[in-house]
Amino acid sequence: MASPPGYPPPPPGYPPPPPGGAPPAGAPPMAAADPYAAQRALDAWVAERGYTLNPNPDFAWYQSWFPFQYAFRLARIGRELRAQFGEAGLFVVEAFEADEVKRVAGEDRHLYCLVTSPKLAARVSIRAKSGGGLVNEVSRGLGSLLSGSSAGSMLGDPTFEQRFDVNTPSRDEGNRALPMALRQFLLQTGWRGILEIRPSGLLMIPYDRRSFDVPTLEPVINNVGQLYQLATG
């Protein structure tokens, strides 16, 4: 290839071959990535499972559940998946925080998984003490330094409360909302996230699942179903 006037010739071997080496002679050109493949896979999976996908969910309805103890305040929401399992309704929505630091760190996006059911009656809020992302870890560390001594055990379960922050109106109500089988499951599986239980509603926000796609949503729905069954069983 000739150099433009006034420019030196390119170095030997320029331009470099593409990653993985040059394609063999006569090979067809590589197909461009399909930007809509993930959405089509999601649409097909939702239809197969009998779920409902809503591109314009009601922001005010989600806001009406606040205040929560640990759940992040919503700035906006994206797509919503709905499902019905017996008496329980499931709503999974893309949720975004209005936090510029978290946005830059890629930690402002979450999955809000809300289960509505008349079986839920008692109140408790828990938050894993690790795994919430760098910004949350730093904020929690500074909060611990500034707050000084702990408020004491909320449940009378030091093993559980070593791993989770807990808030509940009373020890009795907290133990009713968080049965031992549910606590053991959370500990044994190394679960990390936020779980808020109140009359008629259970909110789960997993720390390690943020994408709104089939590989993420399938295990998240299974997980929130397990937590609901253990909370009401």
Positions of PLM-derived features:
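Charged, low-complexity intrinsically disordered regions
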Residues: S3-P23, Y36-G233
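A short, highly charged nucleic-acid-interacting micro-segment common to nuclease
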Residues: P28-A37
